[in-house]
Amino acid sequence: MGANSKSVTASFTVIAVFFLICGGRTAVEDETEFHGDYSKLSGIIIPGFASTQLRAWSILDCPYTPLDFNPLDLVWLDTTKLLSAVNCWFKCMVLDPYNQTDHPECKSRPDSGLSAITELDPGYITGPLSTVWKEWLKWCVEFGIEANAIVAVPYDWRLSPTKLEERDLYFHKLKLTFETALKLRGGPSIVFAHSMGNNVFRYFLEWLRLEIAPKHYLKWLDQHIHAYFAVGAPLLGSVEAIKSTLSGVTFGLPVSEGTARLLSNSFASSLWLMPFSKNCKGDNTFWTHFSGGAAKKDKRVYHCDEEEYQSKYSGWPTNIINIEIPSTSVTETALVNMTSMECGLPTLLSFTARELADGTLFKAIEDYDPDSKRMLHQLKKLYHDDPVFNPLTPWERPPIKNVFCIYGAHLKTEVGYYFAPSGKPYPDNWIITDIIYETEGSLVSRSGTVVDGNAGPITGDETVPYHSLSWCKNWLGPKVNITMAPQPEHDGSDVHVELNVDHEHGSDIIANMTKAPRVKYITFYEDSESIPGKRTAVWELDKTNHRNIVRSPVLMRELWLQMWHDIQPGAKSKFVTKAKRGPLRDADCYWDYGKACCAWQEYCEYRYSFGDVHLGQSCRLRNTSANMLLQYI
């Protein structure tokens, strides 16, 4: 009886939510709303860096091991072959750093479909450790989303944007994906992009400008894209990219940092995540293209405003790279007048974000690092001279009706490095001697010493600094509504609201609200007035890791509630209310040991089902909870 009751309740809830989310009709006569059947919306998922499976498209015999590579064998990520046949695995992963072609003996290509982004290394042990979008898709199924309504658009995350289009026609295919979704389901799509996937989507929007006649560009966007959720977007780059370039980042894999560096520097996409200055812009290729004259490559350089040279560190918290290089050669006369200590004293050079993006760093260490020439080649050919636009320039708000920028915050994040020669041959010729972290209110070194710099009250998500994540706050208008609410389910007693907060363009906006200790909050910055017919929102999730944010149940709950709110013709506000958050699923119910009953008695009840192993597992949504979403209108 218990099992049947659970099945009936679960089915009833799913059917109810399916009707509410997917079957609603809109009658709102507002330009920001999609006019039509919301059951016809599609979801387009663009994964981040290293978040798509790569499969072999070669036959490679690996000596000294029975594990060879055959067509469609998993390459990224197969830890078994990585451990037993690392040289073969390396050949299937590496690219030529100059022309981005495959290794002569092995080539890999991105997998397709949703399975390519759910688990990178499927298996009983490795699967849970390499999960990316699996939990996201579980929510889609639980809330009754149709299988053809969610579309993944994997890509070869090793390539630069120009090579993605040149080799795979990726952006042509992405355009067709949007058009197919519209034709198949009859409505526009919602874009979910994570990490570098946002860079891919931004490039697509700029590429689309040159693909579609200017007078049809905005119309195409309105017809095909209802909302854009930018999750963990490195809008001004990530310092980990330059760390990977100089010393290698292993991502916890059983490879040396030198091997990781060789791979990373063969991928031109590593530079796509390079930090850059908010004060420097490139030529507007769009207007040059339609003005009748082709832009000269030698003129497509950075143009920086006065603030770049008046402010420190290109607006970042500190100099991103501080590197020791051997002293320059001196004449014999000068050598006589120098002590041995002075003669051996290395030179410490510091570089800002602008000096990383324009190649100054690589030119300075060109004589000491064999990778510098290759990096300069990639930087100029694939980014500075990109035929669409220079991706290493600050973002403007995408011309989409509804934009939601979402990221984690308040975690200790790397913002700068000290490098020195290691005395070892390439690729291990640099060693990190110190790391600078941003903490709330200060910058500290790896040893805990306070460092001078532009420290802010908010920090990043452990991977991308706050300065880069929060750039989207510049997309908000002069008046912003701020709401801070606890991340867990709550009754509204700890919700803080400030309306019409002044926001000066170019400056940060921070919620000046008191937080209870040991409580994680989510802060909403919302603006629906500054741009007629458009909505912009920024969500800051406390203590949410960059790589895990797409698995956050809090994020998924808020996303579904916002979409549920949007489909309601009787919605009284532009954004879903934050006044209260109750359980939405059986998994949200739990046992309150202090009261010896299920928490949230209004929504949950104790209902044992065969196989339950603890009290909390027997707490389930009540049969009467099907109308619980009505409070969010």
Swiss-Prot record:
Tell me which parts of the chain lie in the Lumenal compartment.
Answer: 30-633
Please state, per the UniProt record, what induces or represses the expression of this protein.
By senescence.
Might you give the EC number(s) for this enzyme? 2.3.1.-
Phenotype on disruption:
Early leaf senescence. Strong reduction in total sterol esters content in leaves and seeds. No change in flowers.
* An example Gene Ontology molecular-function term: phosphatidate-sterol O-acyltransferase activity
> Any signal peptide, and if so, which residues?
none
Q: Which UniProt keywords apply?
A: Acyltransferase, Endoplasmic reticulum, Lipid metabolism, Membrane, Microsome, Signal-anchor, Steroid metabolism, Transferase, Transmembrane, Transmembrane helix
Q: What are the transmembrane regions?
A: 7-29
Which InterPro entries would you find in this protein's record? Answer: AB_hydrolase_fold, LACT/PDAT_acylTrfase
Localization of this protein = Microsome membrane
Say if the entry is tagged with keyword Signal: no
GO annotation (BP), single:
sterol catabolic process
How does the UniProt record describe the way this protein sits in the membrane? Single-pass type II membrane protein
The reply on keyword ATP-binding is: no
Catalytic residue list: S195 (acyl-ester intermediate), D461 (charge relay system), H505 (charge relay system)
- Give a GO cellular-component term: membrane
Q: Per the record, what ranges lie on the membrane's Cytoplasmic side?
A: 1-6
Q: Which family does it belong to?
A: Belongs to the AB hydrolase superfamily. Lipase family.
Q: What does this protein do?
A: Involved in lipid catabolism. Essential for sterol esters biosynthesis in leaves and seeds, but not in flowers. Plays a role in controlling the free sterol content of leaves. Catalyzes the transacylation of acyl groups from phospholipids to a variety of different sterols. Prefers phosphatidylethanolamine over phosphatidylcholine as an acyl donor. Not active toward neutral lipids. Highly specific for position sn-2, which in plant lipids is essentially devoid of saturated acyl groups.
Q: What is this protein called?
A: Phospholipid--sterol O-acyltransferase
Q: Name the gene behind this protein.
A: PSAT
